[in-house]
Amino acid sequence: MKIPLGILLSENQADKENILKHLEENSYIITVGDRTTEKMIDFDLIPSLQIVDGIEKREKREPPKLVNTTEITVDNPPAEITSQSIDVIKKAFSMESPVRILVTGEEDLLVLPVCIHAPENSVVMYGQPNEGLVIVKITSEIRNKVQSLLDLME
């Protein structure tokens, strides 16, 4: 997605202090992407839901380390959003966190169904390649915008 869904913090602004300004005390943190997930874990901002694929900028990598995480795997081919992926995302929201969805394929577009199905107090974070970190506070306005994007993709 070329246009960020939320606030874009440039690489040098994406520190813990700036990120905390966009979180509330009880925010349900969701990360999409290995680097974003790793960064939040390093900042001790443990994502309730993490969606990773073990790849960063087309290079294979180890998924971020975190103990006591429930892990679910799902197949999601590049440039697609499968119904299986949507079902797994919905299921993850009903599980005790932290939950990690390990994607075989590509996780990038899963930001969209996450924004639709995330709980009210959610904040979704994902990387904008070569630009920085996108922070999306889930609101009905965001849900409607994302639904319009999904409708265009069908």
UniProtKB/Swiss-Prot annotation:
- According to the lineage, what is the superkingdom? Archaea
Enumerate the UniProt keywords alphabetically: Coenzyme A biosynthesis, GTP-binding, Kinase, Nucleotide-binding, Transferase
Pathway(s) where this gene product acts: Cofactor biosynthesis; coenzyme A biosynthesis
> What Enzyme Commission number(s) appear in the record?
2.7.1.237
One of the GO biological process terms: coenzyme A biosynthetic process
Entry annotated with the keyword Kinase? yes
| Reaction catalysed by this enzyme | 3'-dephospho-CoA + GTP = GDP + CoA + H(+)
Which terms does the record give in the GO molecular function aspect?
GTP binding; kinase activity
A UniProt-annotated Pfam family: DUF359
Reply yes or no: does the keyword Kinase apply.
Answer: yes
Residue sites binding GTP per the record: D34, D53, E107
- Which family does this protein fall into? Belongs to the GTP-dependent DPCK family.
Report what the protein is called: GTP-dependent dephospho-CoA kinase
This chain's source organism reads: Nitrosopumilus maritimus (strain SCM1)
